[in-house]
């Protein structure tokens, strides 16, 4: 078993949210759809304060991936905040949090809702930029397999994610191997096939 996978699984298993903090965040995400300027200002101020806690990213990803009883709008806000937090604050994110996100995020590619799947592809693409493809071979391997999924939504989301990664970091992707093959050697024929069969 890949040692990185063991680390990710351990990180996911050993973390659990504080119920009060989780409840507050979910309520903030629910209110974030308000068009009232004062409500938006208060939410932004509170989220800015909460974002300083070390495991803030874990909470965001947990809400996005696991809180299936919440509205799509609530979960998508959490997901987009997770993507932005990763993008703008990567140096502040602990290895444990990165491992937690790596463990949690890939199943989101098979979400039935288009909005949530699109957010998942954005999170995974940014996460790959942060951790680098060579350090997340399991993630690349899962994406490669998902492109052949019988679930067309999952296959399309995986393909979209892979295309974004190859656009953002072609050299890093080209330096990797998955079972003896370069990811781009797998991706390019699939992209050509998808383009040929596009509606």
Language-model segments: what does each one mean?
Residues 192-193:
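Tandem repeat protein-protein interaction scaffolds
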Residues 9-111, 115, 119-140, 144, ...:
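Alpha-helical solenoid scaffolds in large eukaryotic transport, assembly, and signaling factors
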Residues 1-7:
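Short, Lys/Arg-enriched N-terminal segments with co-localized hydrophobic residues
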């Amino acid at each position: 078993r890949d040692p990185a996978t063991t680390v990710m699984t351990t990180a996911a298993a050993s973390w659990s949210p504080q119920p009060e903090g989780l409840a507050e965040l979910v309520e903030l995400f629910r209110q974030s759809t308000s068009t009232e300027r004062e409500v938006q200002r208060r939410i932004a101020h509170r989220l800015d304060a909460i974002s300083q806690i070390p495991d803030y990213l874990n909470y965001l990803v947990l809400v996005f991936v696991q809180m299936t009883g919440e509205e799509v709008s609530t979960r998508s806000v959490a997901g987009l905040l997770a993507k932005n937090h990763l993008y703008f604050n990567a140096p502040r994110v602990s290895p444990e949090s990165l491992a937690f996100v790596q463990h949690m995020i890939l199943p989101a590619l098979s979400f039935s809702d288009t909005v949530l799947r699109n957010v998942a592809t954005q999170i995974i693409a940014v996460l790959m930029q942060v951790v680098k493809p060579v350090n997340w071979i399991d993630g690349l391997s899962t994406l490669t397999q998902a492109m052949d999924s019988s679930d067309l939504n999952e296959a399309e989301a995986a393909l979209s994610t892979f295309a974004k990664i190859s656009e953002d970091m072609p050299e890093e992707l080209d330096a990797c191997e998955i079972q003896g093959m370069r990811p781009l050697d797998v991706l390019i024929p699939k992209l050509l096939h998808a383009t040929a069969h596009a509606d």
